[in-house]
Regions:
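Glycine-enriched, solvent-exposed interface loops adjoining structured elements
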Residues: 2-175
């Protein structure tokens, strides 16, 4: 990303250079933000939630489940029951096993090439004003980022089948 804005690459986020300070402060948030913007197939996980011994306050919920530590975005739970998210806990009225599909903080080693390229442009777009004081560089990288983002989402979507909607309220109401 630094090369894209005309700076020298860094080998570590540790250090006192302007580029290292900016990268160290912005990198984790930019990556996590990009991971949660779309339901990336490579960043999906399915896991069973642990039922806690905590007792919910009030009468709205009966059970509290612990969300996974690496969860960034909850996609769905199974079985499908009403639930509420409070901090790192899931409150619901089920006491059986609950499974969650979610986006996790996928390590760089698992990123496909299309996502890595998109992240490069996202970083360059956000680094440009802080490191280079260049609005022109930011605008150019923003256009590249938008294109890379579209292509990454398209490529990712081609690898995973579409799950059909199983709920048919208009048909069910007739019978």
């Amino acid at each position: 990303a630094l090369i894209l804005i005309g700076d020298l690459p860094i080998t570590s986020l540790e250090g006192n250079s302007r580029a290292q300070t900016v990268a160290n402060n912005l990198y984790p948030n930019i990556v996590q933000n990009e991971l949660t913007k779309y339901r990336w197939g490579f960043a999906r996980k399915k896991g069973q939630l642990d039922l806690t011994t905590e007792v919910p306050v009030g009468t709205e919920w009966q059970s509290i489940y612990q969300l996974p530590a690496d969860l960034l975005f909850l996609i769905k739970i199974n079985p499908q029951v009403p639930y509420g998210l409070y901090g790192d806990k899931l409150y619901c009225n089920a006491s059986s096993a609950i499974f969650a599909d979610y986006i996790y903080n996928a390590p760089e080693s698992t990123w496909p090439v299309y996502f890595s390229k998109m992240i490069e442009y996202a970083l360059a777009m956000d680094f440009a004003p802080s490191i280079r004081d260049s609005a022109a560089s930011m605008d150019a990288n923003a256009r590249q980022y938008l294109n890379a983002s579209r292509m990454a989402r398209f490529t990712d979507s081609q690898q995973y089948p579409v799950v059909p909607i199983t709920d048919r309220p208009f048909i069910n109401v007739r019978f």
